[in-house]
């Protein structure tokens, strides 16, 4: 019987295609699927493929007006997750035609849209995406990338140093600018607006921008080094955000900042385009990421958010610290750090990388290590992240007993000591504490910092097994 047959049929009849050979132009997704009891994994995987592409809950007359074979998502492989009784990794291939060019927003609306509320699934998590070269090429990506940033700043062969200004809320613009100046004068490369500093009653954005610019230029003149402060342009509307970025450019400062998840991908991509056109670097904070990536079984892994940011655009992004965390997390963090920085990343399941990713020369993003780190962590951070990173010490600078500038000196001395030791062939993993102790002999600022944070231990043995 030719023609339209109404009724509800199993998704797996149309959307589960184990024989499908993936195309180079397909977007590939790895989902961690936890079906409701009694729902077979093939049906669950097919349901995800259907709901995130062309399907709906019943057959519809209009299906006959298009070629589903050309446009449907396909669940092409299912693997049980080791150690979990009812959980599977379902691989889905999406034809490229389903997505608008150059739009992370559209990509996510499809892939992580309705399917996540689907009743037949207990939970659903997107673990990784393979972005085909053909789609990557529709994105501008980071405004400048790692090499251009180094050339702009004239800083080579070491990680960059930053510091988030605290207390994050409540300082007046002038006192805020003073804190920025002290840190930069002491030897940091960057200071940072906290992610929640936008434009509040105690400090309006324009006043902050002016005082921070003054701090930047004064400290540059004194130190002979290029300095920057991440001026947070995040705002309630895209127009206001761009207005703030324009003012930053008029002041002649080198870098602005955006909260890309709360601000949204559309706003972020607009800002990234503005930054490239106007020579501004763009620092990205990931506020709200844990709402999306914290649950093991539901949501989206941060590596997907990191890939999306590289497509949308940003020159720096916060990426965790690794230090003192568990071993597995270290490998997985380094996995998405490589996805941010490198041009080509091989599939490696032990590091959470489900697909080989070729970025076809899209500029790289500097990972930012921030949160709870201090001078004793410096050898570990230098070893783990290497030169292409930004190490941010908020409390680890401002908590110095003698003040911000000595705190900055302590961090810079510790970093330079670690880089020199590494370049001389010493083993940072084994000799880290010794290297810091030696350096503190000729730097009273570092000695004072070592004293304050000496009680805070961290696990360093694990490094040897990497």
Curated annotation (Swiss-Prot):
List the active site.
Answer: 166 (proton acceptor), 285 (proton acceptor)
Q: Which residue windows are transmembrane per the record?
A: none
Reactions it catalyzes: 2 (2R)-3-phosphoglycerate + 2 H(+) = D-ribulose 1,5-bisphosphate + CO2 + H2O; D-ribulose 1,5-bisphosphate + O2 = 2-phosphoglycolate + (2R)-3-phosphoglycerate + 2 H(+)
Provide the primary localization. plastid
Q: Which residues carry this modification: N6-carboxylysine?
A: 192
- GO terms for biological process, alphabetical: photorespiration; reductive pentose-phosphate cycle
Q: Where in the cell is it found?
A: Plastid, Chloroplast
The cofactor(s) it depends on are: Mg(2+)
Record keyword Glycosyltransferase present: no
Reading the lineage from the top rank, the first entry is Eukaryota
Q: Which InterPro entries does this entry report, sorted A to Z?
A: RuBisCO (IPR033966), RuBisCo_large_chain_AS (IPR020878), RuBisCO_lsu_C (IPR000685), RuBisCO_lsu_C_sf (IPR036376), RuBisCO_lsu_fd_N (IPR017443), RuBisCO_lsu_N_sf (IPR036422), RuBisCO_lsuI (IPR020888)
Residues flagged as site, Transition state stabilizer: 325
Q: Which residues form a coiled coil?
A: none
Q: Which GO terms describe its cellular component?
A: chloroplast
- Assembly and oligomerization: Heterohexadecamer of 8 large chains and 8 small chains; disulfide-linked. The disulfide link is formed within the large subunit homodimers.
Q: Which family does it belong to?
A: Belongs to the RuBisCO large chain family. Type I subfamily.
Q: Which NCBIfam families match?
A: PRK04208.1
Q: What is this protein called?
A: Ribulose bisphosphate carboxylase large chain
Organism classification: Eukaryota, Viridiplantae, Streptophyta, Embryophyta, Tracheophyta
């Amino acid at each position: 019987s030719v023609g339209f047959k109404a009724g509800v049929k199993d998704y797996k009849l149309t959307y589960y295609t184990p024989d499908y050979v993936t195309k180079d132009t397909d977007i590939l997704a790895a989902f961690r699927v936890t079906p409701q009891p009694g729902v077979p994994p093939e049906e669950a995987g097919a349901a995800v493929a259907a709901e995130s592409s062309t399907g709906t809950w019943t057959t519809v007359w209009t299906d006959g007006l298009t070629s589903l074979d050309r446009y449907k998502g396909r669940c092409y492989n299912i693997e049980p997750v080791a150690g979990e009784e009812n959980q599977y990794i379902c691989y889905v291939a999406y034809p490229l035609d389903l997505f608008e060019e150059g739009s992370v927003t559209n990509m996510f609306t499809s892939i992580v849209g309705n399917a996540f509320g689907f009743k037949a699934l207990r939970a659903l998590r997107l673990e990784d995406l393979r972005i085909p070269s053909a789609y990557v090429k529709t994105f501008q990506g980071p405004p400048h990338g790692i090499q251009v940033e180094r050339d702009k700043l004239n800083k080579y062969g070491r990680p960059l140093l930053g510091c988030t200004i605290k207390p994050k809320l409540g300082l007046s613009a002038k006192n805020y600018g003073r804190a920025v100046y002290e840190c930069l004068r002491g030897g940091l490369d960057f200071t940072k607006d906290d992610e929640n500093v936008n434009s509040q009653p105690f400090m309006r954005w324009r006043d902050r921008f002016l005082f921070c610019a003054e701090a930047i230029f004064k400290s540059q003149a004194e130190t002979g080094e290029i300095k920057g402060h991440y001026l947070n342009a995040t705002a309630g509307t895209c127009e206001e955000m761009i207005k703030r970025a324009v003012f930053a450019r008029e002041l002649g400062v080198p870098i602005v900042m955006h909260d890309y998840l709360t601000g949204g991908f559309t706003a972020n991509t607009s800002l990234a385009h503005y930054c490239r056109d106007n020579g501004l670097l763009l620092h990205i904070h990931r506020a709200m990421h844990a709402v999306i990536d914290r649950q093991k079984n539901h949501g989206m892994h941060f590596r997907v958010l990191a890939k999306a940011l590289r497509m949308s655009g940003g020159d720096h992004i916060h990426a965790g610290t690794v230090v003192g965390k568990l071993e597995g997390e270290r490998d997985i963090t380094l996995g998405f750090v490589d996805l941010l920085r490198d041009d080509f990343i091989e599939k490696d399941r032990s590091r959470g990388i489900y697909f080989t990713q070729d970025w076809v020369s899209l500029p790289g993003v500097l990972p930012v290590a921030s949160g709870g780190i201090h001078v004793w962590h410096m050898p570990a951070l230098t070893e783990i992240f290497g030169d292409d990173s930004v190490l941010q010490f908020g409390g680890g600078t401002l908590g110095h007993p003698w003040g911000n500038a000595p705190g900055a000196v302590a961090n810079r001395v510790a970093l330079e000591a670690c880089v020199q030791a590494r370049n001389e062939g010493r083993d940072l993993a084994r000799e880290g504490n010794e290297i810091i102790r030696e350096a503190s002999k000729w730097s009273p600022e570092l000695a004072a910092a070592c004293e304050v944070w000496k009680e805070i231990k961290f696990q360093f043995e694990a490094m040897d097994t990497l």
